[in-house]
């Protein structure tokens, strides 16, 4: 996917995360619907292309719709040669605006990983796709320098 397409996907995700994805106006939920389903689909497309652009191997991209009270989440876990990256996109229930979480992982089943880093909805809306790639690649460089120091 092109940088322009991924930048558009970032903007689309930011717009979707700006609305209440868990509110369906008192109707019973029988699976994800409407904006929530669009969020889950766009999120997975975005993360698959992100993994490819970062050169990740052993990639798993998934989504979890959750229940009626949450937005659901899209996640990516992928490996480089000496470690990997976990990325999760969701709408925070507390309204903090932190919509994209990322951290290093040691292996593809590492759900603790390194320190959490966050990108806000506003940053997702304003940053270029290359800025996001640079932020994630910086984490990889930090990981590799920590490994060499140890």
Segments the model singles out, each with a brief description of its role:
Residues 40, 47, 135-143:
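Charged, low-complexity intrinsically disordered regions
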Residues 1-8, 141-150:
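Short intrinsically disordered terminal tails
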Residues 5-6, 15, 20, 113, ...:
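Intrinsic disorder/low-complexity signature
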Residues 73-134, 145:
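Intrinsically disordered, low-complexity regulatory segments enriched in Ser/Thr/Pro
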Residues 3-80:
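Negatively charged, low-complexity tracts enriched in Asp/Glu with abundant Ser/Thr
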Residues 12, 49, 133, 147-148:
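N-terminal cationic amphipathic segment used for targeting or macromolecule association
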Residues 21, 54-55, 140-147:
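Generic secondary-structure transition motif, activating predominantly at the C-termini of alpha-helices
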Residues 17, 31, 38, 62-66, ...:
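Alpha-helical protein-protein interaction elements
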